[in-house]
A protein has these predicted regions:
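A nucleotide-sugar donor-handling region in carbohydrate enzymes
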Residues: 455-556, 693
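Conserved catalytic-core segment of nucleotide-activated headgroup transferases in glycan assembly
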Residues: 369-385, 514-596, 670-672
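Catalytic binding pocket for nucleotide-activated donors in carbohydrate/polymer assembly enzymes
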Residues: 597-601, 628-701
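Short aromatic/hydrophobic "clamp" motif used to bind/position activated sugar donors
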Residues: 86
Length: 730
């Protein structure tokens, strides 16, 4: 029931955006002096019951809303249109400023039947989209007639009416309409008829840019092209055949583009997603292509070989060639990477070996450190179970702290030993998402600890994904299906994880974070002194922990983020160098290595220190921005400052937050270095000002932690199998 409610909320939000978009476009039409009293909106999906009130509200503004398929909706639009032109745009998509006006001006200047422009695909909202970069990467420049090579280039990838401005009287005169017998390819016959009938009267303006926006939530809100649809090949062939009946021998450019479209379709889908009985039909279509030699020139040598064999009807030969070609592409060459070869052993040998329920596979931050909740769960297991289990730690470099613990095995990330143990261990403990290829076997118990109470929006709560893979949400969903348990530190996190990860609430362990157990240790003062000694921090100095996070829109590559040190360390050294030091801790995603030699004796770099929880104990004050470290640091009830120099931009445009930072944080938001310096001079006053808010914050986010989270988690997760109560089918 809760899952359906969440999906309903997502649909509600999407419908509301569509209605707002329709209303805005009507206003834009008025501004361009287009006529028409009302707009009716037709949608391609059934509406959730909770939309009824929403639709009543918008009905007064834009007319009525009906649920029908895409082709039917477009035909209704053509029937209801009253203006001089009709124009097609999806509600998820958007235009470069002036794009529609350029098409209108061009149509009137050239007396054109149809005008269009460049199309560019993107995953981002307009606020995060680089229009200038997109304009440089489009293939049509300037104003040209839509014919010859320009027509071929424009339509070889897809026949779509998006970004077409068409004279309405021409549509009515020739009774153009969309094919309602097909769900996915209704544009094909419409486009071919239009392009044929309007030949010589069509123009394209390369500076008129249309952005086709992909949807990055394929679980809740898939676009039509992203929906699970089985095999489309039969429907595509039907649409292709209908187009052939429209095209005449003299329509060479149209035929070339259509044939190229079919070749691309076959190449992408065969053999997995083309029904066996349809494959010979594709072969026959290729054999009848009049410009076969020109079409096939666009492909590489291996692709040409496979397509040529297919064209001759030798499908039994074509299938292995196609598989080899796709395998070669996936391997990025004939040899491939080592991990890809290790996975061959995984599939054919390792996963056929018995599962070891007494082996525990442990990974923290992709093998970068012996740290976080996996560390404390492991140490509790060593303390209470000892050699009853074999512990396999994923760690790329040696760790002195790990070496001092009990018996264990260390493996490097993505090594052969990594693949072997990952295939056979009966337990997995991770604090980040697992590799997509590393799928667990039946009977494995997967404990996902996660790595912090979220401040920044996660997964399905995010709109644009600016730095991770655009399949981020789909991958996240698939990964979550493998987790048997997910740890939460508080009710707030439980609510977020259930929604953002689309995860069953019953499997969330709201037990507190094991990594915070040390913050309640009886010997925490001794640990703090030990940490200072390890880092060379002088005794008696006030330790200011500076722990900034990464920015979603500043990155080199996926998982490798840029970092600009915004805090003026030189000024802090001048103001506080006599009695204070700065302990710098950057996020594990940050790729930049900072040169701090000029601040020697004042700034201590703790970014490579394995366990951030130990750094908390050594710190008197925490300065952060949007990092979740303050949720954990607050367990110590020590002062926290928030240096958020880009607060307005970050909160509103980059990722968004789960809380109202200005009203709920347990410390002040400081936007300038002057404000930071002033705050550090008046810490007593700040602590008094934020005392009540800090207490409320602690109760909301820290009250579950008490130093025994590791015990609760281990006795639940491992105790179930030990007591014979584990549901192995979960």
């Amino acid at each position: 029931m809760r899952r359906r409610q969440q999906r309903g909320a997502k649909i509600h939000e999407r419908v509301e955006k569509r209605l707002d978009s329709a209303e805005r476009r009507r206003e834009q039409a008025w501004e361009m002096e287009k006529k028409g009293d009302s707009i009716s909106l037709y949608t391609d999906k059934e509406l959730h019951p909770s939309e009824e009130d929403l639709l009543d509200e918008y009905e007064e503004k834009i007319g009525q809303v009906y649920p029908f398929g895409v082709s039917f909706c477009r035909n209704i639009g053509l029937e209801k249109a009253t203006g001089e032109y009709v124009y097609f745009i999806d509600c998820d998509d958007y235009l470069m400023d002036g794009a529609l006006k350029r098409l209108l001006d061009l149509a009137e200047e050239k007396q054109a039947v149809m005008t269009t422009g460049n199309k560019y695909s993107s995953w981002f909202k307009p606020v995060n989209f680089d229009f200038e970069k997109a304009k440089q990467e489009t293939f049509i420049e300037g104003v040209k007639p839509l014919e010859g090579q320009t027509l071929r280039d424009r339509f070889v990838e897809m026949y779509s009416v998006q970004h077409f401005l068409i004279r309405r009287d021409f549509v009515m005169e020739h009774e153009l309409s969309f094919d309602t017998t097909t769900r996915f390819y209704s544009d094909m016959t419409f486009c071919v008829k239009l392009l044929k009938l309007a030949s010589g009267k069509m123009w394209v303006d390369g500076d008129s840019l249309y952005i086709w926006r992909h949807r990055n939530d394929q679980i809740h809100l898939p676009a039509l092209c992203q929906k699970k649809r089985g095999h489309r090949s039969g429907e595509f062939l039907d649409a292709y055949d209908k187009c052939l009946h429209i095209i005449k021998p003299e329509d060479k450019d149209l035929r070339f583009a259509l044939d190229h479209y079919l070749m691309n379709f076959f190449w992408r889908k065969y053999p997995a997603r083309i029904l066996r009985e349809n494959a010979p039909k594709f072969a026959k279509a290729m054999a009848n292509m009049p410009e076969w030699k020109n079409v096939i020139k666009e492909y590489g040598i291996f692709q040409r070989l496979q397509l040529s064999i297919t064209r001759k009807g030798k499908l039994r030969m074509a299938k292995p060639v196609m598989k080899f070609n796709k395998w070669r592409k996936k391997k990025k060459g004939l040899i491939g990477s080592r991990i890809q070869w290790y996975r061959v052993l995984e599939r054919h040998i390792f996963k056929k070996m018995p599962l070891r329920h007494d082996w525990v596979f442990i990974e923290s931050f992709f093998g970068k450190s012996y740290s976080d909740s996996p560390k404390y769960l492991y140490e509790y297991l060593q303390k209470t179970r000892g050699d009853k289990y074999r512990y396999i730690w994923v760690l790329n470099n040696k760790s002195e702290a790990l070496a001092k613990t009990g018996k264990h095995t260390r493996v490097k990330m993505n090594s052969l030993r990594y693949v072997y143990y990952a295939s056979r261990c009966g337990y997995r403990i991770f604090n980040v998402r697992q590799p997509a290829w590393n799928k667990k076997r039946p009977g494995v118990v997967f404990l996902e600890t996660w790595h912090g109470t979220p401040l920044k929006k996660l997964a399905f709560d995010m709109d644009d994904i600016t730095s991770a893979s655009q399949n981020h949400k789909t991958l996240f969903y698939k990964h979550g299906r493998e987790w048997n348990y997910l740890i939460s530190a508080n009710r707030f996190s439980t609510d977020v994880f259930e929604r953002a990860f689309v995860y069953d609430r019953d499997k969330i362990l709201e037990y507190g974070y094991p990594r915070n157990d040390i913050l309640y240790a009886d010997n925490k003062e001794e640990i703090a002194a030990e940490v200072k000694k390890e880092l060379g921090i002088p005794e008696g100095k006030r330790v200011i922990l500076y722990a900034p996070t990464w920015r979603d829109n500043q990155f080199y590559d996926r998982g490798k983020y840029k970092f600009t040190l915004a805090l003026d360390l030189g000024r802090l050294q001048k103001e506080f160098g006599e009695d204070s030091v700065v302990l710098l801790r950057t996020h594990y995603y940050i790729a930049d290595i900072l040169d701090l030699t000029e601040y020697e004796g004042f700034v201590y770099n703790g970014s490579q220190y394995e366990d951030v929880s130990r750094l908390y104990l050594a710190s008197d004050i925490c300065i952060t921005d949007y990092s979740s470290v303050f949720f954990d640091f607050a367990n110590l009830k020590r002062p926290i400052l928030f240096y958020a120099y880009d607060f307005d931009e970050y909160a509103d445009e980059i990722r968004g937050m789960y809380m109202d930072m200005e009203k709920e944080l347990p410390g002040p938001i400081l936007r300038t270095n002057d404000a930071v310096v002033d705050a550090l001079h008046h810490m007593d006053a700040i602590e008094e000002t934020y005392k009540e808010r800090y207490e409320e914050f602690y109760e909301r986010f820290c009250s579950v932690d008490d130093g025994h989270a590791s015990e609760r988690v281990i006795e639940k997760v491992f105790g179930e199998r030990e007591n014979g109560t584990l549901d192995t089918e979960q």
